[in-house]
Amino acid sequence: GLMAAFAMTGTTALAEECAERGALDAMFCDANGDLVADAPTDESMLKDPSTLVFAYTPVEDPAIYEDIWTPFIDHLSEVTGKKVQFFAVQSNSAEVEAMRSGRLHIAGFSTGPTPFAVNLAGVEPFAIMGSEDGQFGYKLQVYTQADSDIKEMADLAGKRVAHTSPTSNSGNQAPRALFPDLGVVPDQDYEVTYSASHDQSMLGVVAGDYDAAPVASEVVDRMAERGLYDPAEVRIVWESDPFPTTSYGVAHDLTPELKDKIKEAFFSYDFT
């Protein structure tokens, strides 16, 4: 009873201190109305950790990313003057929870989980990847087997269709928002099966375990480059306009100086 009363009192006090938080969790405040969590007004609450923890969205096997990110992590360490540890997260929800609990300081969140990271974990997104010609983003693509009888989206009715995970944009949220206007309603016209990842969805289509799957174009492009499937075995049924890609963000409660150094590291590094 005492703990519950204390928790309620704390929440009430927090609510009284914060006049505006929009869709943010009760842990955070948004007095300036920019839709992301404000830094703590009490400077003693600001963090300046000796070791920074960085994670990247687990759209594919997390193990492949550590080597890919090592050169940037070295650069980040040099610019900030701190040790940097790569944290291989296993799911979108685990990544959001790690940031919310203070175990993560810098992260790349894929499109779907970004609003959850902002609202539930207090992330401040500051950048996405782009190309030198100003292009950015990826597409939701619906794949089926090359010899499939699925020719248009309405043909998905009654089929085995794999979504990736509930929080994924191209793997679940965008299909639920866009497919009804294309003639098919997920969970109504076909039963949704979650494969757990874009690469598992794609490999499942290739193997015939699924009749079709909505996936992120950037993931299947990388899979093809690595020889994980033969593009001749599959066919695109439909693709969307581009969505913003992975957002990079920092924890809201890092010191302003540290946030600036982290951003400097991202913007001064040659990712090409």
Named regions from a protein language model:
Residues 86-97, 186-203, 242-244:
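Short helix-initiation/N-cap motifs at beta->coil->alpha
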